[in-house]
Amino acid sequence: MKHSATFSDLATGPQARAVRPLPEPALTYFPDVRSAPSDRDLTAGAAPTSPSAAMVDDEPHIPVLLDRCVELLAPALTRTSTDGSGATLVDATLGAGGHSERFLTQFPALRLIGLDRDPDALHIAGDRLARFGDRVTLVRTRYDGIAAAVAESNCAATGVDAILFDLGVSSMQLDRVERGFAYSVDAPLDMRMDSGSDLTAAQVLNTYDEKALARVLRVYGEEKFAGRIAAQIVRRRANTPFSTTGELVELLYQAIPAPARRTGGHPAKRTFQALRIEVNAELESLRLAIPAALEVLRPHGRIAVMAYQSLEDRIVKTEFAAATASRTPPGLPVELPGHGPRFVALTRGAERADAEEIERNPRSASVRLRALEKVGGQ
């Protein structure tokens, strides 16, 4: 297995810091992540999750829509040979490597370029995919660095055959409570997908002014009580800065009216989503990543993107609509030669997991899958 220069010097990951169960509801549901959905909002008196249960997930992380992703991308990977010889797949959100492992196994000559900003994910996936040897190249980067990663892997001249995005925070990241992504257990307010980046959730809470905090919560969390929450954050931090997820959850229970807490899931879910998106610049990265990915595809190459919340899916939908639109100037009665769409849609709108998959893998309940193929000669 080959590693990029940005990956070779990674440490084995930060040591876990002490965590303790919250005395508040213990849910692990986010509306935008690969975790089991729930329409319940536990009462404040609910039994807390134990640290061992929260930190360790013994259940296997089943890749979402795995068969459908293979079905959509396989034609692009087998144009030359049924074993994937000569083809390159970019897994732009490598995670634990579940999707990549399936592709490498099913197509025994396929080459993989795996991207992830999370050094822990790269180590875990690296171990999982080690048996595939030099067919695998891992690159530590955000997915908007896809063009540079492809160039570094000597594929820039020819392009790649298929690209897969599986967006959102992964189950693996949620399970590591010391990372601060989940609100079910008290832990440091971190939320960085890349432990080497500077901004943390605690810094957002402790340094953004009230107007900026409200904007983050309203835009990225679609939180209707954004102004009220932001005001209480500013008042509280004047006496004691925020340092743990438990402190934030406690404030959210005070800030959000009781009737609103009883519906729509855990009252912390929107604020935690908003902070995570802000800390990791997720939407900005995605807006850059999709056009860059479309550019590095070779003719007849395919791309599949799985989104788990409306903000991400809206960006994907917009970029895909532009890519499949005619380039003939509006108002002309016929399409000009060479001005047709650069891509064709492979899915009718966004596909969702069926009931059977959701029962087998509850993490797939909120997924939206869209896919395109690049028109030949483009």
Curated annotation (Swiss-Prot):
SUPFAM superfamilies: Putative methyltransferase TM0872, insert domain, S-adenosyl-L-methionine-dependent methyltransferases. InterPro entries: RsmH, SAM-dep_MeTrfase_MraW_recog, SAM-dependent_MTases_sf. Residues 43-54 have a biased composition (Low complexity). GO terms for biological process: rRNA base methylation. GO terms for molecular function: rRNA (cytosine-N4-)-methyltransferase activity. It catalyses: cytidine(1402) in 16S rRNA + S-adenosyl-L-methionine = N(4)-methylcytidine(1402) in 16S rRNA + S-adenosyl-L-homocysteine + H(+). Its main location: cytoplasm. This is Ribosomal RNA small subunit methyltransferase H. One of its GO terms (cellular component) is cytoplasm. Keywords: Cytoplasm, Methyltransferase, rRNA processing, S-adenosyl-L-methionine, Transferase. It is found in: Cytoplasm. Belongs to the methyltransferase superfamily. RsmH family. Residues 29-56 are annotated as: Disordered. It comes from Mycolicibacterium vanbaalenii (strain DSM 7251 / JCM 13017 / BCRC 16820 / KCTC 9966 / NRRL B-24157 / PYR-1) (Mycobacterium vanbaalenii). Its EC number is 2.1.1.199. Specifically methylates the N4 position of cytidine in position 1402 (C1402) of 16S rRNA. The gene is rsmH. It holds the Pfam family Methyltransf_5. S-adenosyl-L-methionine binds at residues 97-99, 116, 143, 166, 173.
